[in-house]
Amino acid sequence: MVPIKKISTACDLCRQRKLRCNGELPKCQNCVVYSETCKYNKRKRVKKPNVDKDDPHIVVGQPPVKKSTAGITREYTEMIELRNHIITLSKRSVNMESRIDDMLNLLNYDLSEKRETSNEIPSLVQQIQNCGFLIDEKMRRYPGIFQIHPKDYTMNDLFPQSFPTWISVYRNVPEKAWANRCVEWYFRYINSCWPLFDLENFMDLFDNFYSDKEKTKGAWVVSFYAIMALAVSRSKRKDKEKISKSLFSTSWFLVQKPGFFLTARLDKIQALTIMIQFCAHLSLYNLCKVLCGQMCLMVKDLDLHKEATNPNVDIEVDELNRRVFWTCYIFETTTSLIFGTPPELGDLEIDCQLPSMDVLPRFTESSQGGIVFCSEIQLTIIKNEIRKKIYKCLASASEEVYKEAVLSIRGKLIVWERNLPDELKQYYDVIKLNGTIPKNVDFENQHIFTACVEIYLSYCITQLYFYDPLTNYETCLEIARKAADAIRSYFMVIEPIFKKICYLWLFLYCPFTPFQILFSNILKMEKGTSDEKIEDLDRMYSLYRFFVEMKEINGEFADKLSRVALDCIDAAEHYLELKSSVGSNIFELESLLV
């Protein structure tokens, strides 16, 4: 068999096989994966108007030189050049005027005006920019020193556009006993909440791999090395970062082999999902986004969003397909909300049942993972409905349709909260009321309590999406305070098991949304006394501390969020200090700030 050269056939693999490309990507799929120059990239073609070169009224960059015009005078040439310079200067002046208008629009930015035309839930970058606009609106001469002003943040600042460049793969097969411990850790802490693999089937392939490495090939090996990378990165080894990156490099090397993305298979979706989790740890969000797009294409090709029509399909296989689909659904929806990109799976007509709890032991040893998984599925479905029925239809739908959608989603939120399983309900009510930590929260129950904190944060963020701070300010402020209190009050319970939570934690339960609302409340001075403002500032400090602690889990992403949070806290402190020094004279305060 003649080996396929990766560099010369990357584009041809997409073109000849008529492989569907992700609409967001400017390149074909293989060129994105191989980081190559694409020959079939989407270029914007500009039609050139037909110009009569003999028309003296048409000014071009250089006058055409014909045989009949060889004796053109020097004065005529200078006249044409002068005319070109005048046109160039006029274009520059027009561009300068438009830039000045844009700058004036930024200075006069008003959040309430933006909401009327917005048809999408604000992305994380937009939320950070809103904080920056609010600082400029209320404190134009604020002497704060920003590394990057919040209003100047872009997607590239928060999510670096980079791919892995490691060339040192893990060349030796991991020792079996060590690998077995890593696999056990993965199934106990990760696969329990995000069930991608059947434990029994995975261990059968694991034993076959170590008995004869030639029998086990393909996507399972990619998943194996990615699982090893996840487990080693959470271990206590001193060289864990080096070893985990080397193991992940092996997965990345295997994925780049020609043909991996040409056919859709369930084991490939499983491998890509594991790799997405590790990419989040290394802050390789461009790669995370690309792999997520490839994962969604395979999900659509296999019709995992539909129930199996063949009655002879094995129940366990059917259940595995459901769990893989819903895991991809949660990851894709959550990352698209953070990135601000259109949903890939949210717009599908989903006809897939929720996972059954009867086959739970095949995926995990504990029951808590399945309970959390099903609860998060239902919340993610509600988030997608908010996105489609509230934001997308806000400008086009009639008032009756809009009110009907609001009532429907509000009812689903109430039903979701009432139907929580008993295992979560007892702790969920304590967290909701900001009560003291129950005495029965020992080491065994710590994971269930932490899962309740995660579910409660996800519920609060879903409510903030639904109510929208610009239309239901008081309600959202109360929800944001409760979300911050959950982290502030139960941080001591979450902290000991940081190493056991998913690397996509900040994507799934990002508390920057409540942070932004608390910050806006301090600067807007709309509601609350001075004591309440100081209490909100303390809540912001708690969230900042949480971002700092999450650096070990989410790396550069958490580090950048902590810097943004600290800049906002400095601005809020400066604002409160000026307010207290001026007293109740609001006119004097405005003159100092603006």
From Swiss-Prot:
Pfam families with a match to the protein in the record: Fungal_trans (PF04082), Zn_clus (PF00172)
A Gene Ontology biological process term: DNA-templated transcription
InterPro entries reported in the protein's UniProt record: AtrR-like (IPR050987), Transcription_factor_dom_fun (IPR007219), Zn2-C6_fun-type_DNA-bd_sf (IPR036864), Zn2Cys6_DnaBD (IPR001138)
Keywords on record: DNA-binding, Membrane, Metal-binding, Nucleus, Transcription, Transcription regulation, Transmembrane, Transmembrane helix, Zinc
Membrane topology qualifier: Single-pass membrane protein
Keyword Transmembrane helix: yes
Transmembrane segments: 501-523
Localization, UniProt: Nucleus membrane; Nucleus, Nucleolus
Molecular-function GO terms, alphabetical: DNA-binding transcription factor activity, RNA polymerase II-specific; RNA polymerase II cis-regulatory region sequence-specific DNA binding; sequence-specific DNA binding; zinc ion binding
The entry's DNA-binding region: 11-38
Cellular component terms per the entry's GO annotation: nuclear chromosome; nuclear membrane; nucleolus; nucleus
PANTHER family for the chain: TRANSCRIPTION FACTOR PDR1, ZN(II)2CYS6 TRANSCRIPTION FACTOR (EUROFUNG)
Protein name per the record: Uncharacterized transcriptional regulatory protein C1773.12
Source organism of the structure: Schizosaccharomyces pombe (strain 972 / ATCC 24843)
